[in-house]
């Protein structure tokens, strides 16, 4: 049974994974989301339909920059304005920050001084050390750095108060445009700053990342893996150091040589993620500490620039709010560090493995062996000492022995890069497949396998491992692959009360007889089959990743939250050393068509809606015995069937009599009359929970069943509808297992399939959102309305799909006729 914890666990170890392919070029578009223009992906048709309501396509950085230069104005970002709405969302800050542009803060402001490096990052009064540790790692790889931080920006040439940065966002690269207004207090930057007072790239990068997530407060607390992946688009592996392999130092050394990014931390005993406050520390307490800290800083010395003092003097760093726990050795629990180097040095004739780390605070350091104040430096060769100390010239960076490192630190993160990013042709590349998905409450949010009644409803992805690894030292026929499940937008939605879900996944082998059919595996399969592999546990992190080795075969991956009924979006990435194929199951949309014994005569209709319903002109269940009645008379005929009336059953005669009583002499019924006849019959079924069919539902039924465009139903049309309702009623009762008069929305998938409709996961999700109530139940009238609409829409599509290729072309009149009369 799965267990749930609130901290990460180590993945299975082995050779480090590699992400695939060349680096993608950053897309320029909407500042805070993936690209501009019309959206794509999940529910793309629905979102595209409403996209003009949300806003027009965003202008690119170049367009905005050029416009500001032409008008000779400084850019002000309307999406992330320089006011309190961009700072905190949980409560108002008691101190008034002043937003200033760099030229207003100091003389001679510079974007980058002497190249961006790890010493340019000093943490301010915000708990985002995890993000700053990732920046420090990023500065070690110039190629990656230049992609995230375009270097053609300055405060002199073509300065317009506008800057841009590029981040990976769930499969896409996005260009985030900001103005250069920064929050200050006593003329000092409140948040991240550089070691040089007049250098601003790190502060502006932090602002762009805050915009990406909606506010500065949204950056409080996180994992270095998040920042690493958003800077690279690559995959991060997570190690619990106490469970690390014996060759961990070798793994770290190899990662440094490859240019991989690494971060580490020490558990604070509260099961909180890096940079978070201890349990119980609210945002209000954090703000109070920030206020006290800034006031104390103001009293210590003046922030005014002394006359004749250059603005490029070192920044006096305000030590950030220390809700992390500082240890006697100088290390800080619950705090993120960057691993910036590894070396070996001779000490008393023996080789000692060393690790170089950096604290984003820029001040608080390790004070044990190999620290700046270490008393045994005299036992180290002078040249060796000079070489090591030359590499840690700034505050916040220090050496410690590898033994001390694994003794004190508890977690290590390694962000593995592509061969292109690593600038090496010899490194092994991995192939990748990416799938987007969504958990929808009441349909596809089934929870983990502790909940067998709903686990099977989760999204399922088929994985075909086609080729074994090339490993001459391994005789097993094995495929190595890595699965990474990432939940989307939870940090940005914090202000709406969203927190990270506890997520994980399981992998099952598909029986050979089911290979290639792409069917959604049912409840019984998971009840009687054990998983072949799974994430070690369920974790409340943005991404869960795990390395596996399985024989070539076909598998199904089931990603889920720990608890059922939790809604959210995710991406599922699969990396493998050899060729693999990963895709969502049930991606074919179709409807079972009745086998017709004779081809019906062509009928001419007066509208496109009627044309889309043309197959109802002939009874689908019994087409033999047709007479030579003309189409027009046939449509108006009061006869239930073209055959002999004497063959009618007692039920059919009763049906005809009821219909005649309601319809009158013209033998056609309108929506009001349809409502009366349906409710009159349904009310006799006390086992169906329904408040009766509404007038609007009946109007929709008429529109979807009307074969002649009259706006009414004749006997034949009504009989077809009634037979369908009776068939669907049996399906409804079959899935009403508790005889409550409703069915659980999770059962709607099977009910739809039993009715002959085959949909994909997105359509099942949409049906649940459209027809289920807040208790995830569907009553009888909603159930019938859903099936009538499916029947009508499939019939309409097939009527216009002349060549059967699954694509139709409509003009605006046809489109409006089909959608307005439905």
Swiss-Prot record:
Keyword Hydrolase found: yes
Q: Which SMART domains match?
A: calpain_III, CysPc, EFh
* Record-annotated EF-hand domain positions: 650-684, 693-726, 723-758, 788-822
Expressing tissues: Skeletal muscle.
What is catalyzed by this enzyme?
A: Broad endopeptidase activity
Q: Where is this region: Domain IV?
A: 650-822
Task: Report the protein's function.
Answer: Calcium-regulated non-lysosomal thiol-protease. Proteolytically cleaves CTBP1. Mediates, with UTP25, the proteasome-independent degradation of p53/TP53.
The name on file for this protein is Calpain-3
């Amino acid at each position: 049974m799965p267990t749930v914890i609130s901290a990460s666990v180590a993945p299975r170890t082995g050779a480090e994974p590699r992400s695939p392919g060349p680096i993608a070029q950053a897309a320029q578009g909407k500042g805070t989301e993936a690209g501009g223009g019309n959206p794509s992906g999940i529910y793309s048709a629905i979102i595209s339909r409403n996209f003009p309501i949300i806003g027009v396509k965003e202008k690119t950085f170049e367009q905005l920059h050029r416009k500001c230069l032409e008008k000779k104005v400084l850019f002000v970002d309307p999406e992330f304005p320089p006011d309190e709405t961009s700072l905190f969302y949980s409560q108002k800050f008691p101190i008034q920050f002043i937003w200033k542009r760099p030229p207003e803060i100091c003389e001679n402001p510079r974007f980058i001084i002497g190249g961006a490096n790890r010493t340019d990052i000093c943490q301010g009064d915000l708990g985002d050390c995890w993000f700053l540790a990732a920046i420090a790692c990023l500065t070690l790889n110039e190629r990656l750095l230049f992609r995230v931080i375009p270097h053609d920006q300055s405060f002199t040439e073509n300065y317009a108060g506008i800057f841009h940065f590029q981040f990976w966002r769930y499969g896409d690269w996005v260009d985030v445009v900001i103005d250069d207004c920064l929050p200050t207090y006593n003329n000092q930057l409140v948040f991240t700053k550089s070691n040089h007072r007049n250098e601003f790239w790190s502060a502006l990068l932090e602002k762009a990342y805050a915009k990406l997530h909606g506010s500065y407060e949204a950056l409080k607390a996180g994992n270095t893996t998040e920042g690493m992946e958003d800077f690279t688009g690559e995959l991060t592996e997570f190690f619990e150091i106490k469970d690390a392999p014996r060759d961990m130092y070798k793994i770290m050394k190899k990662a440094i040589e490859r240019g991989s990014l690494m971060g580490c931390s020490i558990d604070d005993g509260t099961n909180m993620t890096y940079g978070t406050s201890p349990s119980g520390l609210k945002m209000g307490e954090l703000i109070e500490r920030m206020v006290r800290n800034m006031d104390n800083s103001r009293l210590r010395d003046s922030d005014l620039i002394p006359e004749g003092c250059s603005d490029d003097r070192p920044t006096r760093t305000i030590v950030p709010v220390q809700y992390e726990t500082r240890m006697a050795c100088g290390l800080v629990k619950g705090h993120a560090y960057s691993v910036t180097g590894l070396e070996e040095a001779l000490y008393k004739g023996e080789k000692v493995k060393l690790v170089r780390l950096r604290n984003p605070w820029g001040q608080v350091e390790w004070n044990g062996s190999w620290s700046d104040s270490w008393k045994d430096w005299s036992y180290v060769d002078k040249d060796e000492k000079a070489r090591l100390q030359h590499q840690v010239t700034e505050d916040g960076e220090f050496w410690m022995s590898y033994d001390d490192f694994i003794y004190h630190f508890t977690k290590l993160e390694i962000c593995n890069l592509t061969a292109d990013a690593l600038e090496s042709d010899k490194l092994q590349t991995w192939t990748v497949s990416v799938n987007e998905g969504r958990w929808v409450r009441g349909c596809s949010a089934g929870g983990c396998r502790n909940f067998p009644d709903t686990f099977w409803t989760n999204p399922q992805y088929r994985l075909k491992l086609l080729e074994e690894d090339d490993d001459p030292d391994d005789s097993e026929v094995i495929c190595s692959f890595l699965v990474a499940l990432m939940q989307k937008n939870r940090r940005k939605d914090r202000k709406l009360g969203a927190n990270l879900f506890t997520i994980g996944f399981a992998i099952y082998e598909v029986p050979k007889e089911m290979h290639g059919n792409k069917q959604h595996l049912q409840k019984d399969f998971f009840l009687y089959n054990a998983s072949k592999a799974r994430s070690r546990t369920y974790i409340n992190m943005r991404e869960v990743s795990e390395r596996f080795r399985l024989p070539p075969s076909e598998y199904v991956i089931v990603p889920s939250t720990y608890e059922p009924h939790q809604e959210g979006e995710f991406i599922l990435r699969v990396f493998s050393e050899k060729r693999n194929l990963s895709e969502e199951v049930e991606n074919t949309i179709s409807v079972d068509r009745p086998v017709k014994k004779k081809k019906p005569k062509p009928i001419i209709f007066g509208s496109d809606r009627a044309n889309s319903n043309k197959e109802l002109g002939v009874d689908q269940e019994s087409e033999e015995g047709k007479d030579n009645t003309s189409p027009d008379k046939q449509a108006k005929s009061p006869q239930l069937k073209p055959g002999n009336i004497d063959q009618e059953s007692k039920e059919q005669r009763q049906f005809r009599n009821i219909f005649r009583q309601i319809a009158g002499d013209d033998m056609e019924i309108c929506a009001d009359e349809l409502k009366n006849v349906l409710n009159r019959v349904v009310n006799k079924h006390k086992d169906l929970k329904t408040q009766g069919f509404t007038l609007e539902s009946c109007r929709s039924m008429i529109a979807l069943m009307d074969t002649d465009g009259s706006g009414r139903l004749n006997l034949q049309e009504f009989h077809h509808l009634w037979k369908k309702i009776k068939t669907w009623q049996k399906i409804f009762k079959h899935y009403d297992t508790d005889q409550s008069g409703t069915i659980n929305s999770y059962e709607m998938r099977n009910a739809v399939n039993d009715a002959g409709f085959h949909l994909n996961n997105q359509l099942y999700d949409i049906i649940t959102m459209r027809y289920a109530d807040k208790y995830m139940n569907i009553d009888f009238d909603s159930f019938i309305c859903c099936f009538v609409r499916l029947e009508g829409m499939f019939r309409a599509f097939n009527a216009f799909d002349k060549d059967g290729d699954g694509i139709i072309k409509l003009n605006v009149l046809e489109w409006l006729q089909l959608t307005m009369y439905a």
